[in-house]
Curated annotation (Swiss-Prot):
Record localization: Cell membrane; Endosome membrane; Cytoplasm, Cytoskeleton, Actin patch
EF-hand domain sequence ranges: 354-389, 694-729
Protein name: Actin cytoskeleton-regulatory complex protein PAN1
Region named Disordered: 1-175, 240-259, 761-828, 1120-1225, 1237-1492
Subunit structure and binding partners: Component of the PAN1 actin cytoskeleton-regulatory complex.
Residue ranges with Low complexity bias: 1-54, 105-126, 146-163, 244-259, 1126-1137, 1206-1219, 1237-1257, 1271-1284
Native source organism of the sequence: Vanderwaltozyma polyspora (strain ATCC 22028 / DSM 70294 / BCRC 21397 / CBS 2163 / NBRC 10782 / NRRL Y-8283 / UCD 57-17) (Kluyveromyces polysporus)
Alphabetical GO biological process terms: actin cortical patch assembly; axial cellular bud site selection; bipolar cellular bud site selection; cell wall organization; endocytosis; endosomal transport; positive regulation of Arp2/3 complex-mediated actin nucleation; reticulophagy
Membrane topology of this protein: Peripheral membrane protein
PROSITE patterns: EF_HAND_2, EH
Pfam families: DUF1720, EH
Amino acid sequence: MFNSFQQQGTIQPQGTGYYPTQQGQQGQQGQQGQQGQQGQQGQQQQSFQSQPPFNSYVQQPNAGIGGFPQGQSSFGNTSQMTNQPSSGFTSGQYAGGSNANSNLFNQSSQQFGGVGNNNVNVNQSSDPSSLLPQGGSYNNAGLQRPQLQPVQSVQSVHSMHSLGPAQTMSSINPIQSQTGDYYGNALSQQQSRTSLMSTSSQMGGNQLYDTNSQILQPQQQQQQQQQNIQVTAPLQQQSTGLYSSASQPAQAANLQPQQTGFYSQQPLQPQQTGFYAQQSQVPLEPLKPTATGFVNSFANNGINNDIKIPTMRLSFITAQDQAKFETLFRSRVSKGSNTISGDNCRAILMKSGLQPKQLAKIWTLCDTSKAGELLFPEFALAMHLVNEVLQGDSIPYELDIKSKNEVNSFIDAINMSIVSGSTEEPAKQATPFDSLFTNGLSVLQPQATGMIPATSFGVPLQNQMTGGMLNPQATGMMPQTSFGMPMQVTGGPLLSQTTGGALQPQTTGFMPSTSFGMPLQTQITGGAMMPNLQPQTTGSMMPNLQPQTTGSMMPNLQPQTTGSMMPNLQSQTTGSMMPNLQSQMTGSMGVGTTSFGMQPQATGNISLQPNPTGFLPVSNFNPTAPLTAQKTGFGNNEIYSQRNFGSSLGQAEEDSISTEEKSLFYKIFETYDSQKKGLLDSPTAVEIFRKSGLNRSDLEHIWNLCDINNRGQLSKQEFALGMHLVYRKLNGKILPNRLPPSLIPSSNKILDNVKNQLKVASTSNDTKKAPSRTDGLSYKNNDDENILPSFRNRRKNYSTNGTSSSSLDNTPRGSPVTVSGANVSSDTGVTTAVTTSSAPVAPVASAVVKDGRIDMLQKSIREKRGQLEAEISRNRRMLNQSAENRENDMRMIGSLKDKIANVPHILYTKNSSIPDDLNRRIDTIVSRIPVLFSEIADIEFAISNSKIELYKLQNPSSIIGSGPHGEITDEDRKKARSKALLKSRMAALTGKAEEAGNSIEEEEARYNKAVANIRNESRKNRGIIGDIRGSISELSASLMSTLTGGAAGQNTSEFEKWEFGVGLEKEVRTFIETLKSGGILSGSSLSTETNLNDKEDERVQYLKDQAQRKMEQKLAELGINKPAESPSQQSLSSPSQMEAQATPVKSPFQETQHADERSEDSEDEEEKRLREELERIKLKKKADKEKRLAELRRQVQDAQAESDDGFSSSVSGSNNGNVLAPQVEGTVGHVEYPAVPSAANPVSSVSASMSGSSTPVQGTSAAARNPFFKSTDSSNSTSGLSDLKAAEAQRRSQRGLDDDADAWSDDEPSPVAPAPVAPAPVAPAPVAPAPVAPAPVAPAPVAPAPVAPAPAPVAPSPVAPVPVAPSPVAPAPVAPSPVAPVPVAPSPAAPQPSNLPPVPIAPPLPQVQGVPQPVVPLAPPLPQVKQEEQGNFLAPPPSLPHMDNIQNSQNLDSHSDQDDVLSIPDSVASEDELGDEPGLPPSGIPPPPPLP
């Protein structure tokens, strides 16, 4: 489709005169032949491209413009041709009164350039006066409009020409450049030369006008409609010039009628009524004022109107600003692009004068897509932010959600429009008329088509001379609104024309884009003034707009709904100068509720309503918050405040720290003041100031200003002052050389004031008024005074000042006054308490301060004093609490250590396949590894320190590092600077040349670099050592896991942590090493061992016992002995259980072995010697055992005869059983039962159950065994081993008494924690009377009765069986017991003195001796045992030798007193077991047979 706004090439001015006839004819013929083909192509093409509804009315032409049949008058744009007649053809009249359209549809045989004689009144052409100037018409001298022709062969009437002699001319002179109206399709002088289509193309597209149309539609509407207008059939050729021959006037009467209006019911399309635009314009774009200033400077280079920017509003900028930004955006965007590049945007934004840093922040906020280019909404946002900054606002850290959403929505709309535009608007195809744009019309200049203003409708047309050469005419009234183009002179010899006349009413105006679908009313287009034009439907698609009378100067226009589709806006009268317009809601573009609550404004000449003005406050984040009213006028606005007109010096003095700044700086101070001292040391404060990035000189200046007292520390207020000065410098202000009074901390002011007061008080006389120093703070008015509670004044520094100054002055004479600087201490860390007499100051106070103020000051003094005391007490409490907490922590640590030391070790069962010596070696190595690594770490540390010292010696420097690891501290730097300064000054004084050395900084840098290299090397070495330790720990862990069967060493990290001390604190690691070394006994050690360890004199004995226990453990591992259980356990468990418990018995000794081997490496030799001795003892025991067995059998028979002896022997046997239990318990490793009490406990429980008789039983059993019992010797194991002969004699005498001689058990009495065993032997002293027990044993029936009471206290059931079992045993020893035991008793006594622990145990002996008689009632328990034994005693005798052999082979491994336990009580124990399982023979004792 042809675009009338497209640039059509250079159009040269056209002549308006006429050419000779021959030239005109030739031109006509050539033009017709050339343009005919183009016209035909244009018809065919546009008939398919343009509006389909009109195709049914179109008659396709068979020839081009030059070859039309005579019966048709077709125009190049055939798609607009319809069959519907135009009402203008039937009702209009010529000015002269003749009807020119009488033959409108009858003339069908005229040539294209001919005219009918009967169509035009000749008189009209002959009368020159009928030619009037065309002031408002768009045609000058015969400008025609193409009209839609009916399909029938109808000749168009040339409505604009009167008859004249030149009507039959075949050629017309070229037209001069015209400023009249529309040139689109019919310049009469040019019709024979060019087709109407080409003319239309030259002059700006298919623009159609009425001949005398005085209503010009808005230019923007015409621009939009020009893209869709279709050109109708060409007008018939008319001769418009003056005919040169006499025959021409006759031909002039035959002018053909031309259709000048639209012959269609369809609304006319808008046409461009102005001159050709050089560039296409956006449809519906309102006229904008001429761009000036900043925007115009960019827009002068041209505006890119091809950019597709949706018509959307951005709420954060005004509509005017958005229009300006859009113009600026279009002026800088290159063709084919929708974004402005970064360079172009920078060129625009840099002209704002903002700093590049600020512009960079703005760019970051606006470039939402991070593409480096900005779309229009992003550009508008950037310009908005720049304006905000220029007006004093700050750049937001982040865009608010509303603005961000608007920008994103705008960008989405742009993207959618680009996509839809690319699919819906394909590239335009070439048309047959394209060549005419550049070739045929290249000589035509753009023509102004006449913009007739409303004020020119009433101007009458001037008479024109229709003959001869016309003078240049102003062919149109170019108003001020027609783009400022000057009017064109239409020079050239024009023929006389009938330019006025009574033309038929024409459909005038073009249907603008604002009135689609509404038919235009017919208008009178004749030459007379047309005051009453028909109203037309106006407005842009607004169905509610009222039709308006579009004629000239219509005062009473209908009210219209104004605004952009805003239903809430009041209808306004849009006529001329309506004074009283309706009030409208102003504010935002929204409706009703979104108008920011502003008052409705009358948009006419009525006074405006007052509204809140100004910008939203920065702190108000609600974008719709109402604006606050601002003070206006001189004196009320902050701009006119006095401080803005003062000098810069005054402003500097008035500088102060705001409350917000103070709170912020105080928080920073409290963060770094971790010790709550109220002072910040210089390194910390300097480091904080240094983070600001200021240079050193400025920081020094700031420090000198804020460190008022020159103490190298800053109080809270001084720190806040320093931070304020830092920010002041960062903001570009100059630092003062002296602090202004407003910046001096109030604490310093108070102190200075107090000092001055004290000076005055000291120098004043009682009768003379003291000159007191008063400052501004003394007279400062406190608005809160006497209104608010006094606590509000506590936080005001000046009140403290007033307190300290005037309180002195106002106190009654003679009363002591304390001036307290409590608040000062809170900020400065200095507490000032001054007590002085206020007598000399009283006169001054009475002259200055009222009584009420004195009372208030005194009250504030008391409050401050109370606060100070409370603070002091609080600090004291905190100090005491911290000390108590430390003590509590230490106590908890000590208790934890004790608990850890008392916890028993886990019993690990070692792999028996690994040799014992290998286990010892592994334990030794593992215990040695952490020590080695600790030594290696110490050596490595010493090496690194030595390297540093060596570097210092090799490179002496003025700066020496005294910090950790040789680092240089600030103190070292100060010393080095002092030394360098002193050295330079001394050199200057002495006149010596100062040595040119390196600066302190260079020396420090070299030193630090060397130290860093040494540390790095040391770190690498430590890393290598750590890797080695990790590998060793893995090997050790796997090895220990193998040794313990997976019980230990499974977790390598845990093993490394607790065995090697990796990752533990020094104190914890030391404690673990102490545990391992034996300094603190392990949990597996017996309580008796702990008791022995507490006594230094028993340390040696304890170590020997440990050595013997290790030896026995190793023997057990070799399989020589089987561990034996205590009788108490045997009585409750079967032999299978006894075997099962044998294995765990080893583990405690293995554990103790590991702990002891680490600390006692020298015991190996002693162990070897002990082994040899034990082997010899065992051989002797075997031989003696055989002899004793035979002798025992014989003695048993004798014992039966003597009941007394048998009873004593049975009691002794029972006692032996009792003693056996504690020994085994001790050996098994039950830490909870100490050896001594364990021996006594079972008996004591029995005694409790048996009332008083239990004690003698204990004594009896112990007495029977004590003289010969190995346990006594085991406590003195070393002494017993040293005197082997004495020990052997004891055993023999013991076996003579006991019926069960288990000599093989003597090997292992030592492991039975001799300490516990010792008490057991003590009981034996009373055992001597114990023989009485056998008597009750026989009367089994009697025993049951007493047994009943016994059970209650006998809660420990195992204890009861112990005495019961021996009853059978007693018979055997009965015979020897009366004699042997008594003398034997002294033998154990000898060993007792050697052992310290047994000695205290002796006391029970006398008790037992005194109680022997009551022992008899203890017999009752024996019957119980007897009942259990009755069925079992028969079998034992034969099995005795066999049992002995078995016991010999098994008991070598026992950890308890294998000798004593198995020799005497073993028989009892075996009988106890027999009670549970009769299958086993008791102990081979012969007594059983005699019992039944």
